[in-house]
């Protein structure tokens, strides 16, 4: 077991990729702290960990990573009850910045696809940036980028005690290629990549490694509401011809958290089925 007895905190682990990472880390022997914005969903992941192994137990802590006060309280609890932190996965994220975003994008996506399939012209424009509210922009940046910063800041204080640790930031293929239907999401994920590079240089002398994962389209509760038309288009654009599974991202995270990746820092790995090749 590559992570035996290490203390790992995974944010946004109530479902999807985060839950898969928490389960994989537990299988690898880690003591897993499961964070989610809702206590009940975090506890569901902890219960899943317990059902898989009597020797490994998880711990649920609810906190909104976009709130620095809640993040500070979460890490104080980690320090009090575990006394150390070896691994942090900044995974918490959202798909829409404001109510109605998803429906707007879905409607325009279907309209544009219908126009394309009909031979054009395409008269439905995205127009998302010019219509975006301050609320939508700040919420998206707040959860993804601010949350990554808040959690990393607190984690470094714990990891610096032993001059050892691994931080994994969840970026996205959107940071590499840009998504026309999600300018705020693309910006947040791009910021996470730049933050990863900078912090990796800053803390390398302490033996702390910082890397990122840039998943392609993964089958999770956050992506399933996409329109059938959009889902088919994504598969058509992906050379491997399918969506990824959360467990495939979890395997990547387990590698980066382990000593197998001891010479990796400031890097990004992108399991995306060939959607982006670069």
Predicted regions and their residues:
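Catalytic Tyr-X3-Lys loop
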Residues: 94, 105-149, 168, 192
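Active-site helix of classical SDR
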Residues: 152, 188, 196
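Alpha-helical segment proximal to the catalytic Tyr-Lys
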Residues: 157, 201-202, 262
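The beta1-alpha1 cofactor-binding region of Rossmann-like NAD(H)/NADP(H)-dependent oxidoreductases
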Residues: 39-40, 62-75, 134, 247-248
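Residue(s) in the substrate-gating loop at a strand-loop-helix junction
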Residues: 172
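Short, small/polar-rich loop/turn modules that mediate ligand/substrate recognition or access, typified
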Residues: 164, 204, 209, 239, ...
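Canonical Rossmann dinucleotide-binding motif of NAD(H)/NADP(H)-dependent dehydrogenases/reductases
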Residues: 2-33, 199
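Short C-terminal tail/terminal secondary-structure segment
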Residues: 95, 177, 254, 265-278
């Amino acid at each position: 077991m590559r992570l035996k007895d290490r203390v790992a905190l995974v944010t946004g682990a109530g479902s999807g990729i985060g839950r898969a990472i928490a389960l994989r880390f537990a299988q690898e022997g880690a003591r897993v702290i499961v964070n989610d914005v809702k206590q009940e969903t975090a506890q569901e992941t902890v219960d899943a960990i317990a059902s898989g192994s009597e020797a490994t137990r998880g711990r649920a802590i609810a906190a909104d990573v976009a709130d620095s006060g809640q993040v500070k309280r979460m890490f104080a609890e980690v320090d009090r009850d575990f006394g150390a932190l070896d691994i942090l996965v900044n995974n918490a994220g959202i798909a829409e910045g404001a109510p109605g975003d998803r429906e707007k994008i879905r409607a325009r996506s279907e309209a544009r696809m219908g126009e394309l399939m009909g031979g054009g012209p395409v008269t439905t424009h995205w127009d998302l940036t010019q219509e975006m509210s301050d609320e939508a922009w700040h919420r998206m940046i707040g959860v993804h980028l601010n949350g990554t910063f808040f959690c990393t800041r607190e984690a470094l204080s714990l990891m610096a005690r032993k001059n050892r640790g691994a931080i994994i930031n969840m970026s996205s293929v959107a940071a590499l290629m840009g998504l026309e239907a999600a300018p705020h999401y693309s910006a947040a994920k791009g910021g996470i990549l730049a933050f990863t590079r900078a912090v990796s240089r800053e803390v390398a002398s302490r033996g702390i490694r910082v890397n990122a994962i840039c998943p392609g389209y993964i089958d999770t509760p956050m992506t399933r509401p996409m329109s059938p038309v959009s889902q088919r288009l994504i598969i058509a654009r992906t050379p491997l011809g399918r969506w990824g599974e959360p467990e495939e991202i979890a395997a990547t995270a387990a590698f980066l958290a382990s000593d197998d990746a001891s010479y990796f820092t400031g890097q990004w790995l992108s399991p995306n089925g060939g959607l982006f090749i670069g």
